[in-house]
């Protein structure tokens, strides 16, 4: 941890006692701040709340007391990224002119390790995992490590406080929720894997707001830093060029004009062959793009082709992201629970040459699924739909001419139905194309239940 004066003696309100709220509170205490922690949940029996209280934090649970802002002056409000800006405490802080920031900004300002940041609508977690493993392979030769932190599930504050040294590297996954609250971060390399519409518009309200939040990943970089941009998304690229002072390098699915691109047999950096495509374990063109971005970041940070090959030739996928689960009677089963939108489902469905039995459905966020019709025609032999969107997805399947359509209420029924439809040589793909919140708390929980239900079938 780097000693900084920015938060020393400051009166700070931390909003939300999740894992990141707990971690950033401990970090801020170490940096000399005076803390109040507030959560709408009852914290009377919460062990984390008790631990913070024992360390001198004023803990207020069970409500959002907006009158706190009338009683005293706060220097900062550090909010859980998932809490909307319409929250009464956040709105009151804004009204009072209190700077509103999130955990990543606090943690990265105190990091003595250099860091790189990755964001995007789809693919950022896989890209972060690949980058972390490549860089760890490289740094271990020197006795140091790369740490995957941020939206991937490990708060940056935890690693900054307890693990990372000056010669380590933080590989940070950042969501648009986290980036919206950022006012000053400077990654050595920033990357935006892709940006699609219809993602988190319930939070950001407009697509422009969503893009602006994503652009914060490179907005505060210097000319000596690097920014990796998607050459194939020209409208976004034009905005990226205006948003960052860093040197922009591009990557492309197939255009050799880009700095990094997918060639016929190799992932390329200019004329240099970086990795043989046939040796990459991850399925799908989108994972070749994720691999390309990881190669770009890692090579800029010093890793060599031996480090890249060691990881890409063995890495089989992140949990819930086209995760291979098992083979049931000749049917390969994949868990793509992270597919919370149409774009993510599209890349998953396109990833296989075998006939697919698709299991999809979830929360109805107003998506129109007609864009999947042509994809269904080419790849899907049968479909099982469940959840709030079950009839909407079934309607898209009918338009595609799919003859076998099964509509069920929940995921458990869906797994059983899909397994009966799949034959040896098929792929059973769980790629919901929807958020999980109609029946599950998170996409991770949904994916865990999918795997559990599949394993139950395997044991019969």
UniProtKB/Swiss-Prot annotation:
Localization terms from the record: Cytoplasm
Catalytic reactions of this protein: UDP-N-acetyl-alpha-D-muramoyl-L-alanine + D-glutamate + ATP = UDP-N-acetyl-alpha-D-muramoyl-L-alanyl-D-glutamate + ADP + phosphate + H(+)
Statement: the UniProt record of this protein carries the keyword Cytoplasm: yes
Keyword Nucleotide-binding annotated: yes
Ligand binding (ATP): 120-126
Alphabetical keyword list: ATP-binding, Cell cycle, Cell division, Cell shape, Cell wall biogenesis/degradation, Cytoplasm, Ligase, Nucleotide-binding, Peptidoglycan synthesis
Pathway: Cell wall biogenesis; peptidoglycan biosynthesis
One biological process term in Gene Ontology: peptidoglycan biosynthetic process
InterPro entries recorded: Mur-like_cat_sf, Mur_ligase_C, Mur_ligase_C_dom_sf, Mur_ligase_cen, MurD
GO cellular component assignments: cytoplasm
E.C. code: 6.3.2.9
GO terms for MF: ATP binding; UDP-N-acetylmuramoylalanine-D-glutamate ligase activity
Similarity field: Belongs to the MurCDEF family.
Cited NCBIfam families: murD
Function: Cell wall formation. Catalyzes the addition of glutamate to the nucleotide precursor UDP-N-acetylmuramoyl-L-alanine (UMA).
PANTHER family: UDP-N-ACETYLMURAMOYLALANINE--D-GLUTAMATE LIGASE
Protein name: UDP-N-acetylmuramoylalanine--D-glutamate ligase
The organism of origin for this protein: Lactobacillus delbrueckii subsp. bulgaricus (strain ATCC 11842 / DSM 20081 / BCRC 10696 / JCM 1002 / NBRC 13953 / NCIMB 11778 / NCTC 12712 / WDCM 00102 / Lb 14)
């Amino acid at each position: 941890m780097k000693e900084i004066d920015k938060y020393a003696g400051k009166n700070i309100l931390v909003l939300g006692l999740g894992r990141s709220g707990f971690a950033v509170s401990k970090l801020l205490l170490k940096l000399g701040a005076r803390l109040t922690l507030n959560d709408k949940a009852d914290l009377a029996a919460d062990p984390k709340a008790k631990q913070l209280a024992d360390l001198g934090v004023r803990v207020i649970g069970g409500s959002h007391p907006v009158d706190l802002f009338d009683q005293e002056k706060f220097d900062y409000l550090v909010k859980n990224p998932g809490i909307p800006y319409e929250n009464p405490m956040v709105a009151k802080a804004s009204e009072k002119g209190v700077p509103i920031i999130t955990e990543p900004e606090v943690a990265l300002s105190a990091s003595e390790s250099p860091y790189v940041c990755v964001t995007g609508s789809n693919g950022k977690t896989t890209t972060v995992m690949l980058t972390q493993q490549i860089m760890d392979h490289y740094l271990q030769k020197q006795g140091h490590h790369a740490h995957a932190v941020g939206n991937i599930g490990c708060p940056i504050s935890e690693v900054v406080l307890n693990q990372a040294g000056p010669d380590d590297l933080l590989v940070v996954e950042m969501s648009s929720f986290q980036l919206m609250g950022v006012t000053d971060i400077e990654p050595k390399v920033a990357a935006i894997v892709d940006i699609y519409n219809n993602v988190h518009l319930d939070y950001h309200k407009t697509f422009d707001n969503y893009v602006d939040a994503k652009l914060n990943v490179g907005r505060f970089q210097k000319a000596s830093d690097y920014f990796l941009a998607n050459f194939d998304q020209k409208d976004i690229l034009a905005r990226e060029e205006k948003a960052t002072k860093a040197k922009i390098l591009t990557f492309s699915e197939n255009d050799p004009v880009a700095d990094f691109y997918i060639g016929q047999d190799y992932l390329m950096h200019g004329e240099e062959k970086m990795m043989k495509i046939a040796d990459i374990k991850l399925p799908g063109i989108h994972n070749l793009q994720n691999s390309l971005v990881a190669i770009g970041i890692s090579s800029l940070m010093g890793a060599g082709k031996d480090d890249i090959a060691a990881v890409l030739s063995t890495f089989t996928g992140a949990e819930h992201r086209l995760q291979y689960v098992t083979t049931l009677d000749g049917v390969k089963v994949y868990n793509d629970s992270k597919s919370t939108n149409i774009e993510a489902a599209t890349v998953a469905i396109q990833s296989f040459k075998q006939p697919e039995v698709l299991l999809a459905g979830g929360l109805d966020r107003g998506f129109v699924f007609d864009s999947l019709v042509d994809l269904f025609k080419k790849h899907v032999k049968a479909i099982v739909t469940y959840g709030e969107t079950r009839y909407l997805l079934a309607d898209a399947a009918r338009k595609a001419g799919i003859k076998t359509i099964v509509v069920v209420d929940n995921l458990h029924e869906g797994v059983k139905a899909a397994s009966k439809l799949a034959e040896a040589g098929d792929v059973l793909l769980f790629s919901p194309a929807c958020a999980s919140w109609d029946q599950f708390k998170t996409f991770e929980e949904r994916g865990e239940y999918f795997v559990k239900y599949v394993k139950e079938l395997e044991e019969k």
